[in-house]
């Protein structure tokens, strides 16, 4: 089983950049066109960890093989109980239970903070990602059609939503910091 922990912005940035860079270069899963540098990832992790969890999975040798994180769904205050979530694993780590462990821990962290909704945008088609999200209870809520252009074609993005906790009656308490 993988070891899961909070990402260290400085020490994990190179591994995170290497994993993500393959998806940027070789797939349409992410709409970024240039792989971010380790320095850019260190900054992203550092900015996000003040409000949302950013986790990594290590294999038996202690090498980072995947990451998952939450970030604000939108900037406006009314959305503060919702988080966008993402997960990336190196290809050799797919279908080994690492993604489920990583995402499950991320959702537990979000619940502990008092967040109520997790949202995921998935470039379509992507049967593996859709299946992973559905296995956690995500439901489809819509599709942005032909929203992004990458690798010579227009791409759809499916939006999926998971209720992390029931919405309280009355004013909900503000989410807590990680």
What are these regions, as identified by a protein language model?
Residues 110-122:
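Conserved GNAT acetyl-CoA-binding A-motif
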Residues 69-72, 119-122, 134, 139-156, ...:
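Conserved catalytic-core motifs of GNAT/GCN5-like acyltransferases
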Residues 95-108, 131-135:
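Conserved acetyl-CoA-binding loop-helix of GNAT-fold acetyltransferases
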Residues 18-35:
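Helix-loop element at the rim of GNAT/NAT acetyltransferase active sites that forms part
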Residues 2-16:
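A short beta-loop-alpha structural element at the N-terminal edge
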Residues 33-92, 103-104, 109, 163-165:
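Acetyl-CoA-dependent GNAT
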Residues 94, 120-130:
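Conserved beta-strand-loop-alpha-helix junction that forms the acyl-donor binding cleft
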Residues 166-178:
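Acidic/histidine-enriched, glycine/proline-rich intrinsically disordered or flexible terminal extensions
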